[in-house]
Amino acid sequence: MKLLLLALIQFYRRWISPLTPASCRFYPTCSQYGLEAIDRFGPLKGSWLTLCRILRCHPFHPGGYDPVPPLPSCSCGKSPCD
């Protein structure tokens, strides 16, 4: 499922996005955000984060720098988490 979602985003970036004017208000772009979110959090949570990001990408939002959130850190003080 993860690979399918990543492939769909890559297809969009390669074949559809060049046909439309640049309109993403954020950095990284929404498609790059989607790739990173799905890769970092998996298909379910990554897709949810991407959908929320796309819904924020409209002319009435100021946009700006909006990175994918980091993975939760371990509260035990050890790295990596056990």
From Swiss-Prot:
GO cellular component, as recorded: plasma membrane
Membrane topology annotation: Peripheral membrane protein
Keywords, ordered alphabetically: Cell inner membrane, Cell membrane, Membrane
Subcellular location: Cell inner membrane
InterPro entries: Membr_insert_effic_factor_YidD
Similarity section: Belongs to the UPF0161 family.
NCBIfam families: membrane protein insertion efficiency factor YidD (TIGR00278)
Biological function: Could be involved in insertion of integral membrane proteins into the membrane.
HAMAP family xref list: UPF0161_YidD (MF_00386)
Protein name, entry field: Putative membrane protein insertion efficiency factor
Organism whose genome encodes this protein: Synechococcus elongatus (strain ATCC 33912 / PCC 7942 / FACHB-805)
High-level lineage: Bacteria, Bacillati, Cyanobacteriota, Cyanophyceae, Synechococcales
